[in-house]
């Protein structure tokens, strides 16, 4: 009896609130109603008035509202603002109520964007709160404009921060300064525990203050937080200092910026054990002997540069004397004791303006690319950095030894020059022998093997971020001991000959105890190595790799007869020795134009006995026999293979090899995407293919998009599902195959005649079904009784016009 009594008490309490609200509303509307010329408007419903009053006084009535019966609470939920709606979620679930429809409506009305069709939204509350946090942080939404977003009792950032799993920082690092401000300390602490992915999009040049804020933000979110993935997208002209800052912080290195306060969390972790200054330097690997070696190397670089400048100067101008101080200032490295500076300067002597520190650092990347082998000579020139406006030299931001020693370049000391007027300068002739990147001390890069680190991320992604030699050296040096890294994506970064340094660093990483790298995704326009040789080199360097995706859009320079033979890679990168056994489970390769040597691909496949998924995109072989050699290798050495995909390959002359594949490989899924499979001898080949499939009991998925199957081919394919077939096919993709409605209807009737049960999914995208809409609808209706049909409303006439216009 206790439960009904409690329910009755809550109902009475709600009625009292309703009565009080009605009286208050009536008294407020009485005066305006008398003066209204058109007469009083219809009063709101009693329940709506009550709900509004409860929503407006939730600060006092919240506990009582939570205890209301489910039917009453369900009517109040849409009237609450987002803060109380979020807080009441757990109580609503206990009463069997869902708020997902309310959050979806809020998304449609306030965000006014449609989620991607590829995105499956499992929780609209979390999605709304995450987007709301980002909009408030960037200032793109005004919370005071809507009463559902405005409540003086709550902080929009703090209340929504615990739902943020992914945060994107754009342009001029908007939001970084706000997050590290003292009023938002609790917001940052919440983000540190909830945020998993940090993305940077379309970054532009930023000032010193913004970079300092980003430094503190990354330290909190990565070193003391839960961020495990950092992704950079579309950064056409990366700023060297900012890029290196993001990389080093992601790798677990931390050094306070000039004038910044010590980290509170670091102090709590040390429990009173404050590391000495020497200990802090050792942590970051900035040891004096290595700094001196770097300075000597830098002096030699600058001396060579000055010699070339003197040759181009008028004779009246005296030659420039390179001093230790001029070298340090031009490189903008900071972090050295002021006692090491000598009084002489070279910029004033030559009449050249002294660049500011960031400008010098960012401009230094292009000349350092001369360290590359000759095979990179025809690579596209890297994008030049933006230069400071004329007449604006900018103040020096590193003053005194104390501030300089805390600069990021105290950790990563970058030595490079500036490429001017197409001038060629070979760094290897200057100092430190041949600067091949193998000796980090010559470049001022610290030895990380013995260094201690903070927490680092496990996934790093760089999409369309051109890497200068300076940035590539930094990345490779960090990768060599980044044992926590599990997945690395480098997409269209213009690596060029820096790919050799990357392979060296990956080989060094693989030799580290506890190396976790299991997935590598690499794609670029050009490569100094043919793609198969590059694949062999990666597999040798990373034998524990599980997933490898590699794509090169254009042929390598070694495939060009005009490139001299001595422009090849180092001998330890590419060799003829046999590849050792590896752990590859998934291999995806996108080939440039030109025939590929089948033996090289077979050598990779033979060493990949655990391979389960293989995808070849745009692969071309010299003859059908070479393609058959690859299939024979798969049959003999890749017994665990389950999925095989061919895309954009001309298999019109490889019909016997395709039949061998269907008869001899025990695959679960095969894809022939735009492979011109039925271009030749379709009348003879289709029955042979159908017969092979009818005897294949392991194949469950067949994808044939873009193969000109047509109505005749579709009807022949229907025989796979006949009564005498032992096929287990349950997924069929016949998109883009010139199928007409009458052929699809006949296909549906044959499936009905044979009485096969539901076989799964049928994909019909981009076929000629719009030529007879009535017949197409009837065919799809019949098919849906047998399988799940996925189709679209495709305009075939417009598509044909587009095709003709491009001929």
Curated annotation (Swiss-Prot):
This protein's superkingdom? Eukaryota
Record text about domains: The Elongin BC complex binding domain is also known as BC-box with the consensus [APST]-L-x(3)-C-x(3)-[AILV].
Instruction: Tell me yes or no: is Repeat among this UniProt entry's keywords.
Output: yes
What UniProt keywords are attached to this protein's entry? Leucine-rich repeat, Phosphoprotein, Repeat, Ubl conjugation pathway
Segments of skewed composition (Low complexity): 352-381
Point to the regions of Basic residues compositional bias.
382-396
User: What GO molecular functions are on record for this protein?
Assistant: identical protein binding
Subunit notes for this chain? Part of an E3 ubiquitin-protein ligase complex with Elongin BC (ELOB and ELOC), RBX1 and CUL5. Component of a probable ECS(LRRC41) complex which contains CUL5, RNF7/RBX2, Elongin BC and LRRC41. Interacts with CUL5, RNF7, ELOB and ELOC.
Q: What does the UniProt entry list as the effect of changing residue 50 to F? A: No association with Elongin BC complex
Modification Phosphoserine occurs at: 155, 276, 326, 368
Identification of the protein by name:
Leucine-rich repeat-containing protein 41
